Amino acid sequence: MRMSNIAFYVVSDVHGYIFPTDFTSRNQYQPMGLLLANHVIEQDRRQYDQSFKIDNGDFLQGSPFCNYLIAHSGSGQPLVDFYNRMAFDFGTLGNHEFNYGLPYLKDTLRRLNYPVLCANIYENDSTLTDNGVQYFQVGDQTVGVIGLTTQFIPHWEQPEHIQSLTFHSAFETLQQHLPEMKRHADIIVVCYHGGFEKDLESGTPTEVLTGENEGYAMLEAFSKDIDIFITGHQHRQIAERFKDTAVIQPGTRGTTVGKVVLSTDEYENVSVESCELLPVIDDPTFTIDEDDQHIRKQLEDWLDYEITTLPYDMTINHAFEARVAPHPFTNFMNYALLEKSGADVACTALFDSASGFKQVVTMRDVINNYPFPNTFKVLAVSGAKLKEAIERSAEYFDVKNDEVSVSADFLEPKPQHFNYDIYGGVSYTIHVGRPKGQRVSNMMIQGHAVDLKQTYTICVNNYRAVGGGQYDMYIDAPVVKDIQVEGAQLLIDFLSNNNLMRIPQVVDFKVEK
């Protein structure tokens, strides 16, 4: 049988958002989530005799559902059940797959009914997933697929989660495998959980070239041999062609589906017929079955559990205002970290999902405000290193039209508000108009000017402790205390067990033009 068309459907960075909601409130309905995205795929694929369904990683962590599974079962089985019944053909690993530790990940991989491909992460002498490249026969055509993951994971992940692993360059791994893939396959698909370090049209760098994203380098060197180049990690929406290669990145949380159709002529020459993003929109034929509704109800009930009542409202109405000046919520976050750690200084980012706390605080509020499974470390740093850290945070700001605004470096190609930290226990002033590295002044701890040669302690999350977000000054800092409590649980414990009637002001900073 001669194949004429093959359709490839891709989701990426779903982050455990199965249901059509982001859980910010109960019983809401939004055009998102794996169930609805899968419905879009199934409706569309009917027109093709041959098709593939692909998950491009970051499926295991990131939503309240994932938090719920960890808290109640310690197993990803319910999440796996959703993926298994949707009949994915293959997937790859994302960087967040490691957040709950290697045993949890390996257990999940054993339960999945489709291959998860990753050719550039090794455990001992073999690839972690035991499968880096796989071939699929479609009619008289062979489709070769390689899975690759960003090599930058050691810069973010807790060392104990990855201590037996080695991470290799995606570029070098692809270069190594392509010759053999070309010998065995008529169609080559690269499934890369990583993104682009340069603009696809101009080739101009869009970020510091750290090796985190190698997509442009791979396309520039190997596009003539690649039919489909699937990407993720940056949560961007991309559907275009790079020379003759289809390039896809389908956003996050199941809000869009990447679709590529390849066609072959009578001489078996392969070409890209279409490359697009399918919007995930409401459909009257979409329903959620009774068993799934029951799972969602259990989750919603858990999220609505009331933890405590605060003395006053800490709602964030405007995120930028809460980043440019002290806010009751970021003050509370830093106070909790200072109390838990005993450090001189603490710092926290205000995450994209954060809305602060109303007076009555529920589990939903805590998880929406601290969605990542970060633990914490107390590091010993010099006053000079502390200043370096605050200077890095000060790079978040820029002056546009004579107003303080967010620097483009923290907005493109992917918003990185999580790489701006707000500090507690130290007062400081940021002068945005000054050159980078010279913006911070008036640093005071407990009423005394910060001595650049003196040693202080700072409580940071594990992502920062290994230099995540270009906070390299922390990488070799001695660890004074390791706090193996995740952010959400730390807040739950603090809210449950402390007198909150008087919360001291620990955040004190100014941002000036």
Describe each model-derived feature in a short phrase.
Residues 1-283, 324-336, 481-486:
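Acidic, metal/ion-coordinating pockets
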Residues 5-7, 17, 30-32, 36, ...:
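Feature captures C-terminal
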Residues 8-15, 150-151, 300-313, 363-365, ...:
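Short, compositionally biased low-complexity segments
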Residues 20-26, 159, 315-323, 371-375, ...:
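Glycine- and acidic
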Residues 55-57, 349-351, 432:
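A general secondary-structure junction signal
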Residues 59, 149-151, 351-354, 464:
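Short glycine-enriched loops at secondary-structure junctions
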Residues 264-362, 466, 495-513:
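A short C-terminal boundary segment appended to hydrolase-like catalytic domains
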